[in-house]
Amino acid sequence: QDVPFTHIPKFKGIIELEGYIGFEQELILDKEGNPAPSLGDFMGSIRWPGFPSSLKGNKEGLFKDLFDYLYRFNIVVCDLVLSNILVDDRSDRPKLVLVDGLGCNEFLPVAQYLPFMGRKKIARKWNRFMKRNRLVDGKSGTDRGFCVS
C-alpha cells in the first residue's frame, strides 16, 4: 500500500536473530533529541502530570488526525494503548505516532483486507480506547478528546 509514514515510524528493515525476528524502525525523538515520550508517560507519570500544556489547545486535533490517518489507510491496530503512542513535537504541528501494536491478531485477518470491515474495527477499537483512558466524556466525546459516532 502507499501509506505515508506520518503517524507510524518509517520501516528500516528486518532483523533476524536465532529464534527471533524483529523490525528496525525510525526512532521518534522529541525537540531536545531524546526519545519521544508516550501518551502513557504524559497521562500517568509524576514527571509529566497530564497532557503537556503546550499541546492542550490542540489535543482534540491530535487525536482526530491519528484516527483519520488510521481510518483512511485502513490501518488496523491490535494493541491500541497509551504506551504505544508517542508525542512527536519536533515540528510546529505536533502529532501522535503509533509505534507498536499494528495489524490484526486474528487467524483470518479479514479486517486487514476488506476496508469496510477494517474501518468498522478501527472505529470500535478507537472509541473503546478513548473511553477507557477517559479521553472522552462517554456522551458526546467532545470535551476531552475525539470519539467517532
Regions found by a protein language model. Give the residues of each.
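A conserved alpha-helical element in kinase catalytic cores
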Residues: 1-12, 114-117, 122-123
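Generic structural signal of hydrophobic/aromatic residues within well-ordered alpha-helices
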Residues: 1, 39-43, 122, 126
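C-lobe/activation-segment region of protein kinase-like
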Residues: 46-63, 69-78, 87-149
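A short glycine-rich, hydrophobically flanked beta-strand micro-motif that places a catalytic Asp/Glu
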Residues: 7-14, 75-89
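Conserved structural core of kinase catalytic domains
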Residues: 5-59
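Short, glycine/acidic-enriched loop or turn micro-motifs at the edges of active sites
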Residues: 29, 82, 103-104
